[in-house]
Design a protein with these regions (language model features):
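N-terminal "domain-start" segment that seeds a small globular fold
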Residues: 126-161, 228-230
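Structural microenvironment flanking redox-active thiols in thiol-disulfide oxidoreductases
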Residues: 182-223, 231-233
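Conserved redox-active cysteine motifs that mediate thiol-disulfide chemistry
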Residues: 167-169, 173-190
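Generic beta-strand/beta-sheet core signal
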Residues: 150, 171-173, 205, 228-231
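N-terminal targeting signals for export/organelle localization
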Residues: 2-5, 10-11, 72-143
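A non-transmembrane, solvent-exposed segment enriched in polar/low-complexity residues
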Residues: 1-74
């Protein structure tokens, strides 16, 4: 279980993963329990609502509305309070990590004035902030961020080689080992064959994979559109 290094005798229940024994770990335990309670109560209510709308098409809007209007605000409000109250210890770091999983970029920006130097000095916090900066750079309406790799012949290839040339470019991120990716290839092929003469370009970007496996999958799946390979591990 997780616990916070603190002066005193720290006890961790290996069955419940609950840390006790010091003031900081008691606060950590209470924070985790409160977050779990907010989620459990919210999702229990959603389960009841689902009984009224078992159809997936009817259910999805209900789920989204309740989560956005009830669960998420309650969760973020509590976590923000914990961050501000614990900006110089591990409880605040935990709350910040959990907050980052539910907030949007505007909410993260608004939080920056509330956290202190200690939290900002942590590598975990810096990595999270970097991720949100990347999200802002790649948000809808922003210029695309170029991607570089090589094509199947080993020549350098970039996303910018295809975007801005007067075509519609559909970027498909995939890997030879990704079963859901492979299952979608026939659908992409149908779309590509239907619209390729009307300005549609599909660019496959194969990631987290080995070149020989990518090449074999391209042949096996009859992928006739351009590919950009990123074989870095």
């Amino acid at each position: 279980g997780n616990f916070i290094l603190d002066e005193g005798t720290i006890k961790v229940n290996l069955y419940t993963h609950v840390p006790t024994g010091t003031k900081l770990n008691e606060a950590f335990n209470k924070t985790i329990a409160t977050v779990d309670s907010i989620r459990k109560k919210g999702f229990a209510h959603l389960a009841e609502l689902k009984k009224e709308k078992p159809n997936a098409e009817d259910w999805q809007p209900v789920w989204t509305e309740y989560y956005e209007q009830k669960i998420r605000p309650s969760l973020l409000g509590y976590l923000k309070q914990q961050i501000i109250s614990n900006k110089d210890n591990g409880v605040g770091e935990y709350a910040f990590r959990d907050y980052s999983m539910a907030c949007n970029t505007d909410e993260m920006d608004a939080l920056q004035t509330e956290i202190g130097n200690w939290l900002n000095s942590l590598k975990t916090v810096q990595a999270i902030k970097a991720r949100f900066e990347a999200l802002k750079r790649t948000a809808v309406g922003k210029p695309f961020v170029d991607i570089a790799g090589e094509n199947t012949e080993g020549k350098e290839t970039r996303l910018s080689d295809f975007v801005g040339k007067g075509n519609y470019v559909l970027v498909d991120m995939w890997a030879s080992w990704c079963a859901p990716c492979r299952e979608e290839i026939p659908n992409l092929a149908e779309i590509y064959n239907t619209y390729k003469d009307k300005g549609l370009v599909i660019l496959g970007i194969a990631t987290w994979d080995k070149k020989d496996r990518i090449i074999k999958a391209i042949g096996d799946l009859n992928m006739t559109w351009p590919q950009l390979l990123d074989t870095r591990q």
